[in-house]
Every structure is written in structure tokens, then in C-alpha cells.
Amino acid sequence: MKQYLDMMRHVREQGAVKTDRTGTGTRSVFGYQMRFDLQQGFPLVTTKKLHLRSIIYELLWFLNGDTNIKYLKDNGVSIWDEWADESGDLGPVYGYQWRSWPAPNGEHIDQISNVLAQIKRNPDSRRHMVVAYNPAFVDQMALPPCHAMFQFYVAEGRLSCQLYQRSADIFLGVPFNIASYALLTHMFAQQCDLDVGDFIWTGGDVHLYNNHLDQAKEQLDREPRPLPQLQIRRKPASLFDYEFEDFEITGYDPHPHIKAPVAV
């Protein structure tokens, strides 16, 4: 994950000093891109241990169209707790926009199902896109989507994905987002009988919080280790039928976890 460490180093050393919504303060750059060849390993950061359970269950939660944290909490995942209301609701966040984008005629658009069908039917289309950032609903969301939109691309039998992330918390958020969308690409590829290609991560406001600078230095001082491999144990009948137990990561030998506060 040299690409990720290079980005962290660049922002830590060259980033502009900025204020932010949380009052924490950041070092920030505008516009950065990384590319990961998914044939060369699963892009899971090795310079600190990530909680893979949270990454997988969150993605399954998104794909279910769910916006209440009960499913996450029932499965030991707490990453959305700080933003939920007293009943566990987050408003019309990712899952709602992915699976039930409101149409002007009162119906709803299942973007995920539409894109999956479109890839199978017309792989060369330039319209394989899913958008989570719906301006009409931003004020109703507990947290507006940071990873705002993604696009698939098919060439030579391989499926690639590019994510645009409007707001990128380098230390805590970005490693999760890279792994999540890499996993999503593998799932789509399996359902479409394609190999995986590249995952391209594109960031807008790419930042390190001031209370993550010491942790970033600790991580930068560590030597990256070989990437693990992802194995999907079965091919479900539907993209929406995957379960946590279907995914196996082998060869993941990370450095120890580094604690850091979440900016809420």
C-alpha cells in the first residue's frame, strides 16, 4: 500500500492548514488519485490492523438498503454509532440512495440493480454509475455521503471501479473505503462473470486531522507488508445474497492497530 502511504506523507508535509466542521482542524490538499491493481492482491492496509468485520458488514448493510444501525450493532459493528439518533436511524444515507433513489414520479430507483443488469447487458456503456450524494436529501442525513459516487468500467474481460470521495479522512476513513469498494468490485465481477481489474480512488478534500498527525507519523515509520488475498467461497444467486462467511482474507499480516479519535 505504498500509494496510500505516499498520499499520507504528501498531505502531512505539504497540506494546507484548514479549519473544518468538527472544529478539529486539518492539513488538506484538493484532488488526489491512487490506483490499485486488484490482480496483485487485496488493498487492505498493512501498516496498521484494520477491523475487517466492520468493512464487510457495513458493505452488506449498504447493499441491503438499510439506514438503521441495528443490523450493524447486532453484528458487533459500532462505526456508525456516533451519528445515529436515539432509535438508531441515520436518515436517507448510502443504502437508501443506492437502492431507493427517489424519482420525480414518486417511484424509487434501485441504482445497484440497474447498474448490475447494465454491465451484463451492455458492458461497454459509459453509464455504469451509482450516486449517493443526493442534494435534495443532504439536510436529512446524519452525515452527508463522503464517498459520493462510483463508476464501473469493463475492458478485456476485467471490471474496474473508480470512486470519487468528496471528503477523505486519510487516517481513519480512507483505508476502510478502499477495502470496501475493492470488495464491492470483486462481488460485482463475480456476479457478471468477469475478472477484477483496477480500483481507482479519487479524493476531493483529502485531509489529515490535527489530532491524527502523530499517529500518521507512527504509521509512516512502519514498513509495508505483502498484500493479502481475497477468496469468495461461493457464488450466490444474487448480489444481495452474500453473507459475511462468504469472504475469506488470507495472508493478512498487519502491524498492530493504532488508536485515533473520530472527528464527529
Curated annotation (Swiss-Prot):
BP-aspect Gene Ontology terms: dTMP biosynthetic process; dTTP biosynthetic process; methylation
MF annotations from Gene Ontology: thymidylate synthase activity
Disulfide cross-links: none
Location in the cell: Cytoplasm
Alphabetical list of Gene3D superfamilies matching this protein: Thymidylate synthase/dCMP hydroxymethylase domain
Biochemical pathway: Pyrimidine metabolism; dTTP biosynthesis
Superkingdom of the source species: Bacteria
Family that this chain belongs to: Belongs to the thymidylate synthase family. Bacterial-type ThyA subfamily.
Subunit structure: Homodimer.
Protein name (Swiss-Prot/TrEMBL): Thymidylate synthase
Lineage start: Bacteria, Pseudomonadati, Pseudomonadota, Gammaproteobacteria, Oceanospirillales
